[in-house]
Amino acid sequence: MRKVRFFLFICILIIPNLSFSDDKFLPNIAELVEDTSAAVVNVSVTKTVKTQSRHSPFPGSPKGFPFDDFFNFPFEEPKQQRERKISSGGSGFIISKDGYILTNHHVVADATEIVISLNDRREFKANLIGSDEKSDVALLKINTNEALPYLSLGNSDEIRVGDWVVAIGSPYRLNFSVTAGIVSAKSRSIPDQGTSYIPFIQSDVAINPGNSGGPLFNLKGEVIGINAMIYSSGGGYMGISFTIPINYASEIIDQLKNDGVVSRGWLGVSVQEVTKDLADSFKLGNPRGALIGNVLKDSPAERAGLKNGDVILSFNKQKIIYSGDLPLIVGRIKPDTTVDAVIFRSGIEKKMRVKVGVLEEIK
């Protein structure tokens, strides 16, 4: 009986400790939000679009007026171009006390007017300092003598898969909404979306239309990325969100501030994935690297001696595991820089020196 009582006593002591111990390991998101939300902004954008309309011989007649068909047949009335304004929006965040703001390029592209709203309902018109489509980063500025809150930028290279992260933004115009989750993957390449130069952070944080341009925080309250896009089969959140790492975005910001444009490295090759079957046929071992399918004429790759069928194993001393790693690495190298590369050709690893070119915009 004593043993039974003693056992029950131990259980009574242990069970409450187990039930309360879980709370110690949960992130204190409430304090983080209180400390950071004042510097998260809503970005309202006005755009002017042109539409075409056909002139009616009966102005003011209702749509489908019977004589419209009579007067328009068989001759086509000239179409008139009209301008109309449309509104859209997203999120952003203040990064300096003098009013610099980060958001996405796709949030402010083609904007004729940009208005920034803070959570205390203050509003400011913003100027577009620079915007880069390939990185989906845009830099705005508001000019005011008023005191502005701003956020600290963290080190996105330090985050680990499984770390807690928090997002604040304005999904579906529900301003300053908070969601949280964990990092699912790092350096995710999504070439099919035209974003092959962005080493995305993937997370399961709920991101929806309107969250674009908002910050992703670590638990220190530091910004580690700019929320940009989701994977979805129907347009809504499905548990897969993508964020531009702040370290990468900072490189873009510096160029936009100083030059107004962004320069990227260029190699001049098209590549494909090395499958297991290809790796076996090459006697490469484990599948890895980027298989060159085509070398452009007069490109940096051709001048360096790269050939079709070469497998690039490393570039600028960075290993290439998947083919999508190569454009991420090359794009971040300053043009005219000479770097080391390791390739696999005819069963042998070979070291090469490559002078990186500049990626020209296609007009």
Name each model-derived stretch.
Residues D310, T338-D340:
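A general secondary-structure boundary signal
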Residues V311, K351-M352:
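Residue-level detection of beta-strand scaffold positions
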Residues M1-F7:
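Bacterial N-terminal signal peptides that target proteins for export
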Residues I101-H105, P300-S323:
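Conserved PDZ fold ligand-binding element
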Residues F9-L13:
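Hydrophobic helical h-region of N-terminal Sec-dependent signal peptides
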Residues F20-S281, G285-R288, G293-K297, S323-P327, ...:
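Serine-dependent protease modules
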